[in-house]
Amino acid sequence: MNDICCIGHITLDKIVTPKQTAYMPGGTSYYFSHGISHLKDTKHYKLVTALAPTEFKAVEDIRAKGIEVKVIPSRHTVYFENIYGENQDNRTQRVLAKADPFTVEQLKDVEANIFHLGSLLSDDFSLDVVKYLSGKGTLAVDAQGYLREVRGKKVYPVDWTEKTEALKYIDILKVNEHEMEVLTGHKAVSYTHLRAHETRSKLV
């Protein structure tokens, strides 16, 4: 059994700046796996991802670093377009393609002590997937994807519609200050505020 399993889409990112346009792989699961690859022991880690065959080179690069990868076929790869102005803090983001969401059936043969869900968009992981994985091990979730919804090609900030129920099954929740404010409705937030949502989260 693996100690840690990260589940999430590897993306194709189009980065547009006033000086150049570049294409590169990305996504929480991609960078998480590259971070793990710098540790001495990678044999107890596994990545589960879903992407189209056109982006399989990103998987090959990760495997070349000694990481075990399970690829779930998808009709498309998540394709982000990030446009930056002269001020790099100003970014316009669009989603030009979405991958298929993960399902319980696809994850039945995946075993680990800790699962980390690298969500990128609000429909990557259903509540059923969250419930299922919470019964198999410690569940950690990156909240950012649940707070982003795609309409057309534009990305809109949204609240996590099923957060009250989902947070009951999550042991570790990764959020930044803005995400915590969206989840709790408080600018000056604390662990106590999140507990008000009846979570089982031990770490935030």
List the predicted regions and their residue ranges.
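Conserved small/polar residues in nucleotide/adenosyl-binding loops
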Residues: T192-T199
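Residues that scaffold the ATP/ADP-binding catalytic core of kinase and kinase-like folds
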Residues: I15, L183, L203
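Short beta-strand/turn micro-motifs composed of small residues
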Residues: G8, T49-L51, A143
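Short polar catalytic/cofactor-binding loops
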Residues: G8-D13, T199
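Conserved N-terminal subdomain of the carbohydrate kinase-like
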Residues: L12-Y23, H38-D123, D128-T138
